[in-house]
Regions:
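Aromatic-rich, lipid-facing transmembrane alpha helices and their immediate juxtamembrane interface loops
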Residues: 1-263
Length: 263
């Protein structure tokens, strides 16, 4: 038998699931309205495309859940099943909310101008948002993390927030960097870009934790795997900050060019 095994007999409380679904559906509805307003004001459907992209990223959830040790009960209101794993409706809504809204907000912030330090603050804010969101959800037990999870706080393995925060940051940075390309019908290219970015960042940042989650090693090595995920995430954020962040704080004059002095 393969190890670790998900808790196949786990069941979700239907009242809690209903509340979660309604709350997230309301957030998605508001976000969609705002995305259409943004389209009307700017003439660009990019925010709407990012909302769609956020939901599309959901297709990778069964894969990352398999290697990352996450399970959703089979009695959930299931949107679809893949890799033998049921994916609930509320999770699809959560993808629209977290990845769609977060990427849009970061992209707009980059267009206004972010210093490299502020890029780091955005990453930390995204991690904090994921931590709060999942900590609240896990009190209602609509899903569970299993296996040899590193860096567990309560019911939440902290390494997940590094991955989940890096995805919208990298995606927003790519769109900002090549903003002139995503015009007209080419705005639709945001969707495959989002899918590719999600897959790449999940693998690039999450692999150290994936290894220890699915391997019975010593506790210390398990925690090292989680810390390694944070280390890789920091490298990714540093690259993003240096690529799209403003080196100097707004309003701070750039240093004058040095003049050559003749001997």
């Amino acid at each position: 038998m393969l190890t670790p095994q998900p808790p196949l007999d786990m069941a979700v409380d239907k009242t809690a699931e209903l509340g979660i679904t309604i709350a997230l559906a309301g957030m998605v509805a508001v976000a969609l309205i705002l995305s259409f307003i943004d389209w009307f004001r700017t003439g660009r459907p990019l925010v709407l495309s990012l909302m769609v992209s956020g939901g599309a990223i959901m297709v990778f959830e069964p894969m990352v859940d398999t290697v990352g040790g996450c399970w959703f009960p089979s009695n959930s209101w299931t949107a679809f099943t893949a890799w033998g794993r049921p994916l609930p409706v509320w999770l699809c809504l959560a993808y629209f909310v977290y990845f769609g809204i977060a990427t849009s907000a970061i992209w707009k912030a980059l267009r206004r101008g972010l210093t490299q330090r502020q890029v780091w603050l955005v990453f930390c804010a995204a991690m904090l948002g994921d931590l709060i969101f999942e900590t609240v959800l896990l009190t209602m037990n609509p899903y569970v993390y299993y296996g040899y999870q590193p860096l567990v706080l309560g019911k939440f393995p902290l390494w997940w927030m590094a991955v989940n925060a890096a995805i919208p940051l990298v995606l927003a940075a790519l769109i900002y960097r090549f903003d002139s390309y995503f015009r007209g019908w080419r705005t639709l290219a945001v969707i495959p870009l989002a899918l590719t970015t999600s897959a790449a960042v999940n693998a690039a940042v999450g692999w150290p934790s994936w290894l220890v989650i699915n391997t019975d090693v010593r506790w210390v090595l398990t925690q090292v795997g989680g810390l390694a995920t944070f280390a890789v995430a920091c490298v990714v954020v540093k690259l993003v900050a240096e690529s799209v962040g403003i080196p100097n704080a707004r309003g701070e004059p750039l240093p004058r060019a040095t003049q050559q002095v003749r001997a």
